[in-house]
Regions:
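Short beta-edge/loop segments at beta->alpha junctions of small alpha/beta modules
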Residues: 1-46
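Short gly/ser-rich loop at a beta-strand->alpha-helix junction or flexible surface loop bordering the NTP-binding
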Residues: 14-19, 43-85
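Short amphipathic alpha-helical patches
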Residues: 26-30, 43-44, 64-68, 80-87, ...
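Short N-terminal helix-initiation segments at or just after the protein's N-terminus
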Residues: 31-35, 53-56, 166
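Alpha-helix initiation and capping sites
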Residues: 34-35, 47-52, 104
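Short, charge-rich amphipathic segments
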Residues: 37-47, 119-128
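A short, charged helix-loop
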Residues: 85-94, 98
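Hydrophobic alpha-helical interaction segments
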Residues: 95-168
């Protein structure tokens, strides 16, 4: 009740049911600043205990030029598709659930790209294979490659096979 009263007064802004934040004032003294997409992503990934993957990340990695309309989050316990603010959110199963910090997330995203190789829009599986091999695997050091191999053990056999072929 107190939070909703403060929300009506403008002291707090409601994100969703039970979640509020205190808006920052801009330099010009204007009211609320817009909530940026990165802040929304951070909030969702912390709430769902996962990391962002899918077509949105594959676009950022340079694997496709298509822009994603749905944001995919890999979580240990997927929930059904929902809408948050102006974003469509889809949750998929995370194959590696016990990563201690966010330093492993780029490797997990790379393994997700290998897993979804045939389903990445606007490109072929062979093209993705060549890009992943040239852009990522050739630039990694031996300890990084060992991390990728250890993380790949929790992925399906097709991912392990592609990683073995690349490292060949």
């Amino acid at each position: 009740v107190l939070l909703s009263e403060q929300s009506r007064k403008g002291v707090l802004v409601r994100i969703e049911k039970g979640a509020y934040y205190r808006p920052k004032k801009s330099v010009l003294g204007l009211g609320k600043l817009p909530v940026y997409q990165d802040e929304q992503f951070r909030y969702l990934t912390e709430k769902l205990n996962g990391y962002i993957t899918g077509a949105y990340v594959y676009n950022k990695m340079g694997l496709t030029e298509q822009v994603a309309t749905t944001i995919t989050i890999a979580t240990p316990n997927p929930v059904r598709r929902f809408r948050f603010r102006n974003l469509d959110i889809e949750c998929v199963k995370a194959y590696c659930t016990d990563y201690p910090d966010d330093s492993l997330v780029p490797y997990l995203r790379l393994l997700d790209a290998i897993k979804d190789m045939k389903h990445i829009p606007g490109t072929t599986g062979q093209d993705i294979y060549n890009r992943v091999k040239s852009q990522y695997f050739n630039g990694y050091s031996l300890p990084e490659l060992e991390k990728i191999v250890s993380l790949a053990k929790s992925y399906p056999p097709r991912v392990r096979k592609v990683v073995a072929d690349i490292l060949g």
